[in-house]
């Protein structure tokens, strides 16, 4: 006897306007604002996992080439491209980090008492979402936002697998299903059959 098949859980999608509101909560020039802004932008821009984010060191950044290195699941290293805004946010964070009392640590992300933990990254996203008046949000939702945006904008599925660090197509298929309705709607808007009659 086989267990019953459970329905596949749809991938929750963070709306673009929510991401914009989330990023607007970082207007300050203080250490925490600069750090949190860089974390959020990095998560949104790369889709990295929070464990990958928290595991980064200063040596994992190449801001001139706009590439960051992460150690993914199975301890597989990956190079992730970043955009101009993310590189700028990281540069601003590094400048205030240099003045932090824990600047001697090799860890990229530091807090009051030491290197940040996965729960610290979770707290950054959760607290900033609350400050923006948004529904509860967690770091993995930013990974979802990255993947769905990549596909919705016509990004290559094989490249997404590489950047996201997935070994199988199962995850790509989940995200493809999540964006299928939006992609069909956009295609129909470009090619409405009845409008050509």
What are these regions (language model features)?
Residues 1-197:
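Conserved catalytic core of the tyrosine transesterase superfamily
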